[in-house]
Amino acid sequence: VRTIDTHCNNLCNQAIRVEAIDEPGCGGANHKYNIIGPSRQMLGVGEVPTFGLNIRFQDGPLKEAGVNGVTNEALLAVLIDRMRGFQRGPFACDENAAVLTALETAMAILHARTQRRDKAGVEGTHGKAPGDGAFVDLEADAMPNEAIRVPIKQTGIVGMGADAAEAGA
């Protein structure tokens, strides 16, 4: 079990435990995560988490394994919907707008990746397409706009930071 703490920016998030609970697969990413709320005393039961969520991501190529878990795109769709809701509500702000733009950009990049792999005839398989493996490890301390600049340029999608300024966004 590997504990993830990149969300721990306030008391609420510090009380929520995020864990990768399996070993990384052949692509380098984990497939199973737990998100667990703080524990409370339950009469006759003991300490129990106030909530828990088990997330299982797609494991294996679609053409071989079938649909057996959620996708990054499905979770992004939830976050995009939530941020759009906040932007329609009384707490709309510049930060929420920036988050929404980043999430929508991430979704567009994932869609572009799927289209590139589909065009190469390898989508849904472990086969490699031109461009796979071209983007290697990011530094853990990379700034978010630096982290997405390379894939955005590779896909031709205009995003945040200097790329957006160059495009006149």
Describe the function of each predicted region.
Residues 132-169:
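Long, low-complexity intrinsically disordered regions enriched in Ser/Thr, Asp/Glu, Pro/Gly
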Residues 1-4, 94, 123, 153:
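A detector of low-complexity, intrinsically disordered, Ser/Thr/Gly/Pro/Ala-rich segments
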Residues 1-42:
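Short, charged/polar N-terminal "headpieces" of proteins
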Residues 46-47, 98, 168:
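Acidic/polar, glycine-rich intrinsically disordered N-terminal extensions of enzymes
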Residues 81, 86-124:
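Short, compact, well-ordered microdomains
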Residues 21, 113-131, 135, 161:
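Signature of extracytoplasmic/envelope-associated structural regions
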Residues 28-31, 40, 47-49, 127-130, ...:
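Polar low-complexity intrinsically disordered regions enriched in Ser/Thr and small residues
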Residues 30-86:
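A short, structured beta-strand/loop element
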